[in-house]
């Protein structure tokens, strides 16, 4: 398990959702 990749995935998803809302 790679916590870094998991954390990066969360950041990417959060950024996409933020850009979609804004």
Curated annotation (Swiss-Prot):
Record GO biological process: symbiont-mediated suppression of host innate immune response
Assigned keywords, A-Z: Host-virus interaction, Inhibition of host innate immune response by virus, Interferon antiviral system evasion, Viral immunoevasion
Top-rank taxon, per record: Viruses
Function statement: Acts as an interferon antagonist when expressed ex vivo.
Note: SARS-CoV-2 ORF3b is homologous to SARS-CoV ORF3b, although the proposed protein is much shorter due to the presence of premature stop codons. Elicits strong specific antibody response.
Name of this protein: Putative ORF3b protein
Native source species: Severe acute respiratory syndrome coronavirus 2
């Amino acid at each position: 398990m790679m916590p870094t990749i998991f954390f990066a995935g969360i950041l990417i998803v959060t950024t996409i959702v933020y850009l979609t809302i804004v």
